[in-house]
From Swiss-Prot, chains A, B:
Protein name (database record): tRNA(Ile)-lysidine synthase
Annotated family: Belongs to the tRNA(Ile)-lysidine synthase family.
UniProt domain comment: The N-terminal region contains the highly conserved SGGXDS motif, predicted to be a P-loop motif involved in ATP binding.
Residues annotated to bind ATP: 13-18
Entry-linked InterPro entries: Lysidine-tRNA-synth_C, Rossmann-like_a/b/a_fold, TilS/TtcA_N, tRNA_Ile_lys_synt, tRNA_Ile_lys_synt_N, tRNA_Ile_lys_synt_subst-bd
Classification of source organism: Bacteria, Pseudomonadati, Acidobacteriota, Terriglobia, Bryobacterales
Top-level taxon: Bacteria
Summary of the function given for this chain in its UniProt record: Ligates lysine onto the cytidine present at position 34 of the AUA codon-specific tRNA(Ile) that contains the anticodon CAU, in an ATP-dependent manner. Cytidine is converted to lysidine, thus changing the amino acid specificity of the tRNA from methionine to isoleucine.
GO molecular function, one term: tRNA(Ile)-lysidine synthase activity
One record GO biological process: tRNA modification
GO cellular component assignments: cytoplasm
Subcellular localization, as worded in the UniProt entry: Cytoplasm
Keywords: ATP-binding, Cytoplasm, Ligase, Nucleotide-binding, tRNA processing
PANTHER family with a match to the protein in the record: TRNA(ILE)-LYSIDINE SYNTHASE-RELATED
Length: 440, 440
């Protein structure tokens, strides 16, 4: 949890757990201790008195004392308080003011957390409960002790602590579990329930650690971050066992929206089902995300919108496609230079147009429903939408799909290339060469 | 769950769930249905009436009816009843009397099971709850419906059912969950608790399916079945992530004792710790198993005992080592035959003795504490115990370790070979060649 000589800041509320922790760490010795306290100012004079109590305790022990006063945002007071404290502790660590922040959570807290999450339904991740050590540097040395043992320690040594009035109030879910449900379940079902739930957490924590490694590996293989979205090939998801697929989808959701807040079993399930459905389209919602299936792809992200554009392209030059990081480059090449441009280049996907056949009023715009033209190699005109279907282009890629027109005629579009009537050939004198580039 | 035309036997207790199931399957059509009923005879006339009710129902529907009367063993009546029913259903499947046995378990049963197991503390395996389909052929078509939906179905169709008196009794854990705890938790914590717990089960079931495959693969690699025991190399266990190591240990315990009854988190944990401890020895208990560490090995099995033996070995011939499937073969080879026995053979692990140097009173016995001799290559006499240490021979292998004596002298022992003073050499006329063989 900490090396000898480490600078350990102890979060002390003034309650039994954290007061015990502070005394125990002083007794242990060999650490550079300091005391942190957060005053939420929620209970007025009482809050003030807690802060003074902790300040005096630190002073008596000759330890540096750091008080943070916070004003809580609206919403769940219990949750907001917890977040404000964690934010403060993480700041202290990030600022290098200490090597570790030690908190007084006990096995009783662990059991309460696991029970609460079980009732809310939160898979193994939730059952893993409170972590004894976090990557950020928070440690919880009392996590294997029960609250009764803590109070015994304090009474034996006649160490005073403050009863937090909020700890008794039934309005907090935590207190209803602590004083109501947990003792009831222990009495009626399992006298060792606190220990049992701590084991459940420990088991789940190891499982989660295993999965984190597995899913890191798989997401590097199978998830692609796009513009404001994450893409998954449905085939790679279908190849996985259901448990792994579910976890990979959770990871994709987390990547796409930054967290997993509000995401439940049903959301994940519907995404997995969308990937396995035989039809290559469909849609489902995850809080904060739009999930679309198109052919072999799933897209998780903010809903994509069509941003119409109509530009005079630079010749020569590169014109950025609005709403994307791609640009269309246009270049004029004279006949005399054809030695560096073999004829077969005319048949590449990007293609070349015969400059003489163009009237010169070029427009670069996005694909529109109903667009049609005759690409080289086809015997007649075809709707671009049909070409999209044939080439399995996902719907979200179509929105900004570039089309080059000359007057009324489509002379080129991405992927399907030059129009048969405008394509450059051996007889062309001046060639307009098209390319697509990524703009950083 | 079942193919069209399948022969489906429906387990009907007479209660709402199973009566609903039977009607629903009749409605569904396309199946060859029959009705199974188990009478535990627990509630005398009432049990009888249940059986008659179900029999009459089957008759009215024109379905074959099979009644099994059982007498329950001592112990937990609820558990014994469940086991007796399952035994009967498995018999029916094994005998080929039906393709599937359909049971009336609902999502409400699922939630009760998950909650009960959570309170008892049973990792993901327990949280997986009731399986909708088992490998043996039991199916539970109502597993996604709640009990209220079942009763609605029956009331709408005015179908009567029997209220099982045992379902109301508070003496059964199941009933205390059904009528007490689950409604309380739903009211106080999560109105959708039954659904939440069903999802927990579904999630856990997929995880377990994944793990079953992983652990099958790993146990084929890392577990060795020995005489009444299972062996694991500690190195292969230490190389695994904790979650995987725990699951592999559970598998090893299951292999060694046939089931996992009575095995809890702490047992598994102590075995994993025994494997990771830096000292190469130690011991822990798992219900029904003795777990020993010796050097790089863990042995899980019935405690090994030393079975003393002292035999006149057959010359020539093979003598079985008592308590093992190994035998020591002794063979006499004349000088004239040395052409087929090159000299370097004398120096193999098994070795050869010079027949002339032996007084002839050979004894084959197990190693005794204090035994010592001078193997070839050592400059003096050495305790065999020291040689065991040097060669890292696990303690359980030492118990029946064979030693060959001639009068007072040890002339040979397994692995360490002939004694320097008795080993055959180029000058030997007649050679006693030793070998060890497996006896099937």
């Amino acid at each position: 949890m900490f090396a000898s000589g480490a600078r350990v800041a102890v979060g002390v509320s003034g309650g039994a757990d954290s007061v015990c922790l502070l005394h125990a760490l002083v007794e242990l010795g060999g650490l550079k201790l300091s005391v942190l306290h957060v005053d939420h100012g929620l209970r007025g004079a009482e809050s003030r008195a807690d802060a003074e109590f902790v300040g005096e305790l630190a002073a008596r022990m000759g330890l540096p004392f750091c008080l943070r006063e916070v004003t809580l945002g609206p919403g769940n007071v219990e949750q907001e308080g917890r977040r404000a404290r964690l934010r403060f502790f993480h700041e202290q660590l990030a600022a290098g003011n200490c090597d570790r922040v030690a908190l007084g959570h006990t096995r009783s807290d662990q059991a309460e957390t696991v029970l609460f999450r079980f009732l809310r339904g939160s898979g193994t991740a939730g059952l893993a409960g409170i972590r004894p050590v976090t990557a950020e540097g928070i440690v919880r040395p009392l996590i294997e002790l029960e609250r009764a043992e803590i109070e015994e320690y304090l009474r034996e040594r006649q160490i005073p602590w403050r009863e937090d009035a909020t700890n008794a109030g039934e309005e907090f879910a935590r207190n209803r579990i602590r004083h109501g449900l947990l003792p009831q379940l222990a009495a009626e079902w399992n006298p060792a329930l606190v220990e049992t739930l701590a084991h459940t957490a420990e088991f789940a924590r190891a499982e989660e650690a295993y999965w984190a490694g597995e899913i890191d590996r798989l997401s590097a293989e199978s998830l692609t971050a796009g513009d404001g979205c994450v893409l998954i090939r449905t085939e790679s998801l279908k190849a996985l066992s259901l448990a792994v697929a579910r976890r990979l989808v959770r990871r994709a959701i987390q990547m796409a929206k930054g967290d997993l807040r509000g995401v439940d079993f049903g959301h994940v399930e519907r995404v997995v089902e969308l990937a396995s459905a035989p039809t290559g389209r469909g849609r489902t919602q995850v809080p904060g995300l739009d999930v679309r299936r198109s052919f072999e792809w799933l897209r998780l992200g903010v809903p994509f919108t069509r941003k119409p554009y109509s530009l005079k392209p630079l010749v020569p030059g590169t014109t950025q496609i609005p709403g994307t990081r791609n640009g269309i480059s246009l270049e004029l090449i004279e006949k005399s230079e054809t030695s560096v441009l073999p004829w077969n280049v005319y048949n590449t996907e990007m293609g070349c147009l015969d400059w003489k056949r163009l009237a010169g009023s070029l427009e670069l715009r996005n694909w529109r429903f109903g667009d049609q033209y005759q690409p080289m190699g086809l015997t007649g005109s075809e709707k671009i939408k049909t070409l999209f279907q044939l080439q399995r282009i996902p719907v979200w890629e179509r929105a900004q799909w570039p089309v080059l027109t000359d007057g009324e005629s489509i002379v080129w579009t991405r992927r399907f290339g030059p129009a048969a009537g405008f394509a450059a050939g051996p007889e062309s004198g001046v060639v307009l060469k098209l390319g697509e580039v990524t703009i950083r």
